[in-house]
């Protein structure tokens, strides 16, 4: 059995979600790793800095992920790769990706991209709220407890 870990795509992770994840990892005794390009001002013993190339962070994070890990990302394509490795994935807003629904999320992403390529405009993300923080904390806690075998 390998060390249980939470891996965070820190390029687009709100600082509050990052702080929540680090606190919960301390509480549960899990290692927490952050991944970001060198353009981001992050550091620490468990921070991995990668090149600034397109998809560099996602590629490194996907390559480092092992079965049983939990990955925090807003990238639906990366989440699909993570699920294929028998790991869990959730967004900083608390949406847990699951194998049964990932195809829907990928199709929705593709439809929005097609719409934008055709000249359409889509809304950006809403401002982060305390409800988002609570939802993320609850979802991450659920996955941590599930991985520990406390939830079936």
Task: Please annotate each region the language model reported.
Residues 1-152:
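Nuclease catalytic cores that cleave nucleic-acid phosphodiester bonds
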């Amino acid at each position: 059995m390998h060390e249980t870990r939470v891996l965070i795509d820190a390029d687009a992770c709100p600082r509050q979600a990052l702080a929540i994840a680090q606190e919960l990892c301390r509480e549960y005794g899990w290692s927490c790793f952050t991944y970001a390009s060198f353009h981001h001002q992050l550091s620490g013993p468990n921070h991995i800095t990668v090149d600034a190339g397109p998809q560099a962070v996602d590629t490194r994070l996907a390559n480092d992920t092992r079965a049983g890990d939990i990955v925090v990302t807003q990238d639906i394509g990366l989440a699909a790769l993570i699920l294929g490795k028998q790991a869990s994935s959730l967004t900083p807003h608390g949406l847990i990706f699951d194998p049964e629904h990932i195809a829907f999320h990928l199709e929705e992403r593709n439809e929005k991209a097609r719409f934008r390529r055709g000249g359409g405009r889509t809304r950006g993300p809403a401002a982060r709220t305390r409800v988002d923080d609570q939802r993320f904390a609850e979802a991450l806690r659920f996955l941590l407890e599930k991985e520990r075998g406390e939830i079936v």
